[in-house]
């Protein structure tokens, strides 16, 4: 009798319209239920039956119901799926042709039904790594989740899976681009012949793509004339060529533990353009004079040229020689003189930047030592030594010169820009600083001078607590076609051109500088390019991190409950515990709050304050160094679990 009853339909519509609705992101758990996080303060419980309609990370609209005085979210509409294109592993039962896939994500454990895309003719096996795309979702009216396999990555037993899986996940190339070997382009540039000068390169022993060579001349007045010669790939790659389009798409050389995937063909990056010892190479060069205090004179000159590197020097050998250690000697008196002059350049520029700009704190680089099978045999901490600083100071000098010339003569280029504190958050930064006895005001902090003054003070403190806390109020560095300051470096402008073999933005700046040299028109870069460059930079960094996490898990699985603790720096404190970085090897581990103190109600983990309190007393602060032991290594999620060390 109630079928098609208009009054009942009206009542249902009224109840539906009166039910409150919220939008948020689904957070899954490993216990079947989940939460809908609306913002940082508010979340709603999602019971297991409702969780079957969604997956972790989905953005949904949900109805809020009250059950036994508890607010419950019932997802109704999918706003943005978490999974679209994803990597996973094939699940296949014996004597069953049906396939399913488990996404490679720590909070996605349920198998999803799947089938190969049309034309993908392969007999998939248990454990195979594949690329897939979601095709069905319960909140889209489908009965269940379903995916389509779009590509095979590698089999489950491949020891090099970390590399292939990660490159596929981040949509990065697996091999170098190809090209038909060409000749030098006719660019209408007169190249100065500098082959007689003792230029040197300083790199790691294994480096093949050497893109910078250095030469210093001392003038009669004691000033130093520095020439930075940079490899010239745009002498072979024209702006409208397919190879240039491929380089723009890749944007960067991808550096992963054990190997790299170049932005340009290896014939170019590792041979024709690489500034190899004893080989005549085309370069784009910058010449500038440094006064004794490290300041740059206004005689900056860019030009095209030919050089012949007279020595391939290695960081550690040069550092040892300058520090009076080891038995290595420069191959000639000319090379020894160049090393000494370059050391003077670095010292002068470092001193100038300490007073007028900013110098980063030295942190070691961590290098994975791999055998032929991709197994990690060791992880080596490589401190930033004097030879590294020589190259760093020369490259920063060169990039400052390019930034100034492009700004003054063109008004555009590819600039690295960092504007310091976010104006919307700067008052919070002031409050934090004042609460920690550091005088500050918002107006000053938003200026380059004010920012630099604060950074120098923070760097002088014995603890990194304030330094690490203050960073969350800062903006991220950006890539821009417009000149702008780089607060992080303490410089009024910064435009890189010193790595054109590895960075497409540097190739663009090369072409702009060449246009100035030739007196030719220069084309303003498309602003959309900067978004693509920034996204590619993010993908490359994530790929390096992901492979690193995988290798750390493999290497450290045998170190669980080892008797000797690791010293670790606390890098983050959250509601659930602390993240720490092992100083010996750079690995990041998580310490659950339950491992710190047994009574949860007696503990306050404050991300806001960067502190962890037990019974009202601060026990740990962000930036502290603490001894820890590894409690668990989870190979499936590539995560490390640690606990505070107790003797």
Swiss-Prot record:
Residues 563-645 form the S1 motif domain. The keyword Translocase does not apply. Keywords: Cytoplasm, Exonuclease, Hydrolase, Nuclease, RNA-binding. Gene3D superfamilies: 2.40.50.640, Nucleic acid-binding proteins (2.40.50.140). Residues 191-517 form the RNB domain. GO terms for molecular function: exoribonuclease II activity; RNA binding. One of its GO terms (cellular component) is cytosol. It is found in: Cytoplasm. Involved in mRNA degradation. Hydrolyzes single-stranded polyribonucleotides processively in the 3' to 5' direction. This is Exoribonuclease 2. It comes from Edwardsiella piscicida. The lineage of its organism: Bacteria, Pseudomonadati, Pseudomonadota, Gammaproteobacteria, Enterobacterales.
